[in-house]
Amino acid sequence: MNAQNRQLYRLFRKIVVKDLNKTTTVLSHDTILWAIHARLGSCLIDLLDTTELSSELISLLNSEELTAKFWFQTQYQMTLELISELNKINITPTLLKGISISTELYPKAYYRAMCDVDILVEEHEIEQVEKIMGKLGYEQSSLLPLPFYETHHHTIPWQHKTKDVWFEIHRKLFPQSSPSYPANIFQIENINRDKQLSPIDSKNDSLQNYRLGYELQVIYIASHWGESFKQIGGLFAFIDIALILNNTTVKWDKLIKSANEPYIANYTYILLSYLVNNDFLNGSTTKQQVNKIKHSLSFIDTFILNKIITNYLFLGDSYGRILTIDNVSILWELFISTKPAFKKLILAPIYIIFPPHSAQKFNLDFQVSRIKNLLFKSSR
């Protein structure tokens, strides 16, 4: 890894150890643009020495920060409003993902970009919650048909009529179609035992909400991230988990025991091992601890998955004719799966030719079109 890329890694480390002292930047214009594209632009004005940057780039970074501050504050205030209304009818929601971890562990909460706000409530509370959403000015909106949400882990998303803030009201952590769905750790009974009262507003403990326990948060974030390859926003899973491990006391025996289920172990291992091997953690987590996770990944699996993480998440490499965004996603899902290693190597070229999730994979016209794209076009 060259000096340019090592410097980029150091910037990521500064976030997860909450070091906001500016550093002399050797980042290229393109590298900074990639960080912005990856949704990390809001923190760069704090971390980079702007004396070496062009006025245009400084203006862009200032704009990223101001936009992130405004957008986060809007989401945050509307979350407080919803929690207040739910508390009035004796419902205490559980905060999930970005809204939970940003308000507790990020050096500045607006660093954590969020497309929507995720909360979890009991199944029998859904109807009451949806009445409150309508009262507060939200309406449900989705391009997917209603039957899709009958087995989904959250109801039809809610969008505010004027402020464009989205909420997802979860009844479970994963849909029935997910490999993570049957895991014991994600069952409602376990969540209810694990969750902890932790007010989102430390200055106003009259607002009551839960957060997942730290061990469950680590496994949930890793599993949600690992099920499919996400380039844009995918880095937040690494930052989220590194902040948990660097700033809280995690019960490793509990984490390892809970993670030792099919698929869950693979997702958790590959992310935690990447953090450890690249010195994202402050020493509280060791390779020996991570290696106790009973995953099914071979050396080749781990090598390929780590290359995908490094090249497409951290360095922002462009996709190519063969390794298109769709094909990288196919390879990711294959090599992180629980299939035997030799089968993965056999299936890899087959899946590239015949995409497993495509209804047209055996359609001749579709295949001819794909082959032309692979041979003659470059895809970002």
Regions found by a protein language model. Give the residues of each.
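Conserved NTP-donor binding/palm subdomain of two-metal-ion nucleotidyltransferases/polymerases, i.e.
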Residues: 1-115, 121-380
